Amino acid sequence: MGKILDGKFVANLLGEKLKEKVKDLKEEGITPHFCVINIGDDPASKIYVRTKKRRAEKMGIIQDIYQLPADTKQEVALNLIDKLNEDPDINGVMVQLPAPEQIDADELLERIDPNKDVDGLTPSNIGRIWMENHFIEPATAEGIIALLKYYKILLKGKNVVVIGRSNIVGKPVAALMLEQNATVTIAHSETENLAELTRNADIIVSATGQAFLVTEDMVKDGVVVVDVGMNHVNGKLVGDVDFENVKKKASYITPVPGGVGPLTVQFLMEAVVKLTRRQNGRE
């Protein structure tokens, strides 16, 4: 029976340490301050923005929300990013995704100053991860690494299968695991032999948004399973993994909710503080 990787618990431990860092900055007259640009009325995005704001307040961080209408033009969003980039009182900028179809989200991300890039998704910061010369990382990927580290799950020499190739989770978590000398395979929607790959994996990270994709027959005994998926099935939030059955074979497994999600939010706050310290010559 798999031991639960409790992301909420780890996030709260990290949160207490981060509060002290914020307190130290405030004693020097510096308050971490970031902005979230949310375009449109996506209900899930609005919930996520509010969740971040609550966490920011708990950490002592200022978060401003720029709520733009769904029909916002690209140039308006770009001009707002330019304004925030140039404001010395703003330490971080992020664009809430997904954006409406008329918006080129990639162009918005490219416009963010890499030194204010809370999400770690500007091209230069993504590139730095692969060059192993990074100062900011996408929050979910960094949260997964922190979770494994807390539970003393070593990556060196392990066979890892990452299911999903997004810039937000799949690619960066693969890069961070390679950096720690894991042997990483990235699978995706066109992978034909997924079960064959996962059965040989010591660690599986699934980030596809496909409910119950990973089943008991696809994993070996003692596997570590990190489920990043968030899917609604019959009014219930579930992951990519058939949790109840896979946990019988896993040595460690994350629940959904309460696994990776709280760490994603926490590491966004960690990023804001890291950027603030960097901009003020503290690291």
UniProtKB/Swiss-Prot annotation:
GO cellular component: cytosol
Entries under Pfam families matching the protein: THF_DHG_CYH, THF_DHG_CYH_C
Reaction(s) catalysed by this chain's protein: (6R)-5,10-methylene-5,6,7,8-tetrahydrofolate + NADP(+) = (6R)-5,10-methenyltetrahydrofolate + NADPH; (6R)-5,10-methenyltetrahydrofolate + H2O = (6R)-10-formyltetrahydrofolate + H(+)
Pathway: One-carbon metabolism; tetrahydrofolate interconversion
EC numbers on record: 1.5.1.5, 3.5.4.9
Keyword Amino-acid biosynthesis applies: yes
Binding site for NADP(+): 164-166, 189
Signal peptide: none
The protein's name: Bifunctional protein FolD
